[in-house]
Amino acid sequence: MSAIVDIVGREILDSRGNPTVECDVLLESGTMGRAAVPSGASTGSREAIELRDGDKTRYLGKGVLKAVEHINTEISEAVLGLDASEQAFLDKTLIDLDGTDNKSRLGANAMLAVSMAVARAAAEESGLPLYRYFGGMGAVQMPVPMMNVVNGGAHANNSLDIQEFMIIPLGAPSFREALRYGAEVFHALKKIIHDKGMSTAVGDEGGFTPSVASHEEAIQLILQAIDSAGYTAGEQIAIGLDCAASEFYKDGKYQLGAEGLSLNAQEWTDMLATWVDKYPIISIEDGMAENDWDGWKILTDRLGQQVQIVGDDLFVTNTKIFKEGIDKGIANSILIKINQIGTLTETFACIEMAKRAGYTAVISHRSGETEDSTIADIAVGTNAGQIKTGSLSRSDRMAKYNQLLRIEEDLGEIAFYPGRAAFYNLR
């Protein structure tokens, strides 16, 4: 038995300079696990609640001392003596202790920090790397990265309404090479943007934030960079979009300020379909607003055979909401964000539900990140096949990519990079 003998929560800062929660868990053997939780900018309204202090005299009200106090008192009392290797029981203990549907009493940030730290301690105790602890000997598949090289929306201060324009190196032979493809395109894009006299400043997730006239111009810049780096768009590198459409959905219309357009769901779907026909787009995330389920059905029926349609704000890593979407034939993929739900056990259940339904699961970071690289191990440990963890700059993003390099090295010859096969939801 790997009994938990001590637990310590603390307030640290994330990649945006905002407070977040870190937790240390000590086992009776002396083994320690540490984890830090991320935080989002564009958040779904049905996400588990991230507990903030609301004290405007500290960190503009964003302090997390209440969440930390919950770890150091109530949660500590409940989990001391529990077996760290019994993750499901530990997470159920946390859920029952909180007693709410959305983890608003203890805070999902407090609960997730404990859940992750316990898993890290248990993996260390067992002598296994974290990905192997999660997935056993079957964990051999590396994820295809979705790299956010142009930022807009809530992640940037520019004219773009769409939040992320991503490159997806699905033609690479390995994860290591996929990372190289992405880095070389990133640097080619930087030169192109610079030569056009635009700013090469980066957004929250490390992508560039150029002030372009339209969304298509942003796509064309990326295609130019792919070509300049010596790669073939569509074959070696595809494009993905995260529209984060809830952010520009107002009064029943999709308001595209960059184009000066106000579109209903059918018109917005037509516009996305035009882009899909014109450009090598293979994935569209949050193409409709989280509450526009009719719009989601229109989008899925129109493009769901040829493009990965990812629900993020739509499903918020919640199996109850996700099941409703599956039953209604909405989307064909789910974005997995551990802090949207608040425990590892619930996260894994959502990934498993996706696989059973023939949906893909994309493991994702948040815009406010830390040096914690747990999601890299989750991506491999669950054989998810895809990961979304930012651009090719900022050390908070590189922490995940570099961990994946280590995992691929550790796997050696049995490491498998799925490439286009990761999009098994497409026909």
From Swiss-Prot:
<feature type="binding site">
    <location>
        <position position="337"/>
    </location>
    <ligand>
        <name>(2R)-2-phosphoglycerate</name>
    </ligand>
</feature>
<feature type="binding site">
    <location>
        <position position="312"/>
    </location>
    <ligand>
        <name>Mg(2+)</name>
    </ligand>
</feature>
<feature type="binding site">
    <location>
        <position position="242"/>
    </location>
    <ligand>
        <name>Mg(2+)</name>
    </ligand>
</feature>
<dbReference type="InterPro" id="IPR020810">
    <property type="entry name" value="Enolase_C"/>
</dbReference>
<keyword id="KW-0479">Metal-binding</keyword>
<dbReference type="GO" id="GO:0000287">
    <property type="term" value="F:magnesium ion binding"/>
</dbReference>
<keyword id="KW-0456">Lyase</keyword>
<dbReference type="Pfam" id="PF00113">
    <property type="entry name" value="Enolase_C"/>
</dbReference>
<dbReference type="GO" id="GO:0009986">
    <property type="term" value="C:cell surface"/>
</dbReference>
<comment type="similarity">
    <text>Belongs to the enolase family.</text>
</comment>
<feature type="active site" description="Proton acceptor">
    <location>
        <position position="337"/>
    </location>
</feature>
<dbReference type="GO" id="GO:0004634">
    <property type="term" value="F:phosphopyruvate hydratase activity"/>
</dbReference>
<feature type="binding site">
    <location>
        <position position="388"/>
    </location>
    <ligand>
        <name>(2R)-2-phosphoglycerate</name>
    </ligand>
</feature>
<keyword id="KW-0324">Glycolysis</keyword>
<dbReference type="GO" id="GO:0000015">
    <property type="term" value="C:phosphopyruvate hydratase complex"/>
</dbReference>
<feature type="binding site">
    <location>
        <position position="285"/>
    </location>
    <ligand>
        <name>Mg(2+)</name>
    </ligand>
</feature>
<dbReference type="GO" id="GO:0005576">
    <property type="term" value="C:extracellular region"/>
</dbReference>
<dbReference type="InterPro" id="IPR036849">
    <property type="entry name" value="Enolase-like_C_sf"/>
</dbReference>
<dbReference type="InterPro" id="IPR000941">
    <property type="entry name" value="Enolase"/>
</dbReference>
<comment type="pathway">
    <text>Carbohydrate degradation; glycolysis; pyruvate from D-glyceraldehyde 3-phosphate: step 4/5.</text>
</comment>
<dbReference type="InterPro" id="IPR029017">
    <property type="entry name" value="Enolase-like_N"/>
</dbReference>
<feature type="active site" description="Proton donor">
    <location>
        <position position="205"/>
    </location>
</feature>
<comment type="function">
    <text>Catalyzes the reversible conversion of 2-phosphoglycerate (2-PG) into phosphoenolpyruvate (PEP). It is essential for the degradation of carbohydrates via glycolysis.</text>
</comment>
<dbReference type="InterPro" id="IPR020811">
    <property type="entry name" value="Enolase_N"/>
</dbReference>
<keyword id="KW-0964">Secreted</keyword>
<feature type="binding site">
    <location>
        <position position="366"/>
    </location>
    <ligand>
        <name>(2R)-2-phosphoglycerate</name>
    </ligand>
</feature>
<protein>
    <recommendedName>
        <fullName>Enolase</fullName>
        <ecNumber>4.2.1.11</ecNumber>
    </recommendedName>
</protein>
<feature type="binding site">
    <location>
        <position position="163"/>
    </location>
    <ligand>
        <name>(2R)-2-phosphoglycerate</name>
    </ligand>
</feature>
<feature type="binding site">
    <location>
        <position position="367"/>
    </location>
    <ligand>
        <name>(2R)-2-phosphoglycerate</name>
    </ligand>
</feature>
<dbReference type="GO" id="GO:0006096">
    <property type="term" value="P:glycolytic process"/>
</dbReference>
<dbReference type="InterPro" id="IPR020809">
    <property type="entry name" value="Enolase_CS"/>
</dbReference>
<dbReference type="Pfam" id="PF03952">
    <property type="entry name" value="Enolase_N"/>
</dbReference>
<keyword id="KW-0963">Cytoplasm</keyword>
<keyword id="KW-0460">Magnesium</keyword>
